Amino acid sequence: MSEDKDYMSEPFIVKKIDDEESLLDDYNPQGNTSFSKTCFHGINALSGVGILSVPYALASGGWLSLIILFTVAITTFYCAILIKRCMEMDPLLRSYPDIGYKAFGNTGRVIVSIFMNLELYLVATSFLILEGDNLNKLFSNVGLNFMGLEFQGKQMFIIMVALIILPSVWLDNMRILSYVSASGVFASGVILASIFSVGAFEGVGFKNNDSEVFRLNGVATSVSLYAFCYCAHPVFPTLYTSMKNKRQFSNVMIICFTICTFIYASVAVLGYLMYGSDVESQITLNLPTDKLSSKVAIWTTLVNPIAKFALMVTPIIDAMRSRFSRVLPNKRASGFLLSTILVTSNVIVALLLPFFGDLMSLVGAFLSASASVILPCLCYLKISGKYQRLGFETLVLIGITLTGIVVVITGTYQAVKDIFGRF
């Protein structure tokens, strides 16, 4: 039971990344986490701020892009099973970087770690943008003058939220925040119910006729945003390792992906029916602020990222502290300094690129598609040895990998183009 509690205290967005020179030692093959708790953790890992962007993704690609959502869900589910197979082939594997190391040596570990850390960094940055957007909607026409510098609306709120979050990043003990961040499971349900309530009972309705069946020029954005919704694969090795009965892991994945896909599809359809092509990159920005259900949705959206921010950046800080341990031998001082520098850089990026939808599209295309689709396929091909013999599954894996590469190239190009187009 104590081991299960220790597991509950770990960040579920991603397991802490070991130093690339570390060996696979001190392995305990017996986990203590039950089936139901693993389902809970899996749903929490899959559910996140992506739920706010799925209506925008649907509006970008049209109604037929729902097929893309289900295709992405099925593909990423299959890639989760590939991760499980890799873990089964070598019981010493405990984390995603370990799988990369097993497949491609230190190069594989470094590549996986870079993708994981960069994804965490940009998602944490998107939290600040999200907070700034929604607080600016609630409290418009608010500004701040500091030492002759004018900070208006969104800029001021981004800085203010960063100052509120910073003390939580300084903490070494993340147990309390880990429990709070688990509210992501309930937050997704609350947001879905609130959006439905706004449409059904508070005057917005579901009869917006400004919608399209298919928009070819928006497909790249749709795929990227949908991919971002399923970017939890770095945590799946941790979930697998923690399970008491690892044979049930596939069933856990079925439940997690089914529930989250239902929620994502429901929010996408409701949001598109309510606002059509006018839907914002965050559905909460469309909601009327004078309605109770809207306030519940917006405040739920605001609280959850604040709790999760520290958990997102802690693995990055730990990796930086390990890298600079000789220069900064004092653990507490180095943690304080590095975490402050990291959060400051998050704020700078958020102020320079304050475009939530475009940033999520970039993360989904470049990082999520790579970490959740391409890397699982390549690692499984190498570890299983299937790359040496041509069969049906090998062809499927090659096809998925090539498709993933196309998504990375086209989605990243479109996201970067959209970002620069806003300046």
Swiss-Prot record:
The chain crosses the membrane at residues 39-59, 63-83, 110-130, 151-171, 186-206, 219-239, 252-272, 297-317, 333-355, 359-381, 390-410. Signal peptide: none annotated. The keyword rRNA-binding does not apply. It holds the Pfam family Aa_trans. InterPro entries: AA_transpt_TM. It is found in: Membrane. One of its GO terms (cellular component) is organelle membrane. It is a multi-pass membrane protein. The keyword Transmembrane applies. Disulfide bonds: none annotated. GO terms for biological process: amino acid transport. Keywords: Amino-acid transport, Membrane, Transmembrane, Transmembrane helix, Transport. Belongs to the amino acid/polyamine transporter 2 family. Amino acid/auxin permease (AAAP) (TC 2.A.18.5) subfamily. This is Amino acid transporter AVT1J. It comes from Arabidopsis thaliana.
